[in-house]
Every structure is written in structure tokens, then in C-alpha cells.
């Protein structure tokens, strides 16, 4: 069940949903707007001939911190990692979905490629996968609204929420945009 504004307020008051920093003015009818942090990870395309998710490629991205009062310029066709300003923490009976903002989508900004789902028990900054599909550069200002967080209540609490020892939870407590750690639990399954 998708939570409404009054449900979101109740979960925040109960401590089962937390955003830090939190601004009540960002609560919408069925979501909470989240803002862009000033940390980005850009791809070092000149260092690799390809990306292999089964291998550790530490130099694939480099951290960039945007100076106060300056934008990050995302050029057409570029893909970068960024993160929410807010640390988002979900209880074991809540799951989240990060969606883009319609106004930014209409300018050609994609907020996430595939990873918009947030598991119950997660706590940390949410990594954004930003792409510019427009024909002009897009100025990304730290502190601007970048997405909206939708919260869903599970039918029952997760038996093993994110952050528990069962799953490893590679991104629990992440600060800023975190590069892929797919290689840490890489495996393939038979195709026949």
C-alpha cells in the first residue's frame, strides 16, 4: 500500500521512517521530495575498454565535490552517479521507490537507470544514476529537488531486512554516491 501524506507524517513521528535533514515542506500528497547532494562520481572512460560487473574496477569512477554555490554540468549523453542530500532510513515494514521529478524529466534528466527500489531496513544516502538525454547541458544545483520518495507498507515485516547479516547489504550506511559493488557477490546461473 502506497502511503499518503498523513501516513508519511505518522511513520516519521513513530520513527519507522526518517529523512535527515528533514523539511516538512517537502511532503507531497503521496511522496516526499528529496534533494541533490554536492557529491558526484564521474566515469573514467579513458582507463577501461569495457565495464565488467564481475570484476572489481576501482578506478572506473572518480569522486567530484561541487564547490558551494556552483552547479554540476551534465552534458548530453553523459551518465554520472550522485546521491540524495538526505540520509533515508526505513523500518522493517516499509519499502521505498525513488522516482524522478516530472519537471526535470521534461528537460531530459533521468534520475535513475534501474535502481529506484529501496529495501526495508535500508539506511543511507540513496545513490542516483543521472543521465542527460537532452541535446543541451543540464545544470544540476546541489540542494535542488531531484526526485520523490514513495513509501510502501509491507503486509508483514521483512524477516531479514536490508542490513541484516543474511544478505550482506553492500550499500548499508553509504555516504554519497557509491560505485557498483556487483563483483562482491557475483555469480551466474545455468541458462538451460
From Swiss-Prot:
Output the SUPFAM superfamilies linked to this UniProt entry: dUTPase-like
Q: What is the enzyme's main class? A: hydrolase
- Record-listed E.C. numbers: 3.5.4.30
Signal sequence residues: none
Entry's transmembrane regions: none
Keywords of this entry: Hydrolase, Nucleotide metabolism, Nucleotide-binding
Catalyses:
dCTP + 2 H2O = dUMP + NH4(+) + diphosphate
Fetch the CDD domains from UniProt: trimeric_dUTPase
Pathway of this protein? Pyrimidine metabolism; dUMP biosynthesis; dUMP from dCTP: step 1/1
The residues responsible for catalysis, as annotated, are 129
What molecular function terms (GO) are annotated for this protein?
dCTP deaminase (dUMP-forming) activity; dCTP deaminase activity; nucleotide binding
Pfam families annotated for this entry? Answer: DCD
Keyword Nucleotide-binding included in the entry's annotation: yes
Family the UniProt entry places it in: Belongs to the dCTP deaminase family.
**HAMAP family in alphabetical order:** dCTP_deaminase
What does the subunit section of this Swiss-Prot or TrEMBL entry state? Answer: Homotrimer.
Protein name per the record: dCTP deaminase, dUMP-forming
Q: State the organism of origin.
A: Salinispora tropica (strain ATCC BAA-916 / DSM 44818 / JCM 13857 / NBRC 105044 / CNB-440)
Annotated gene: dcd
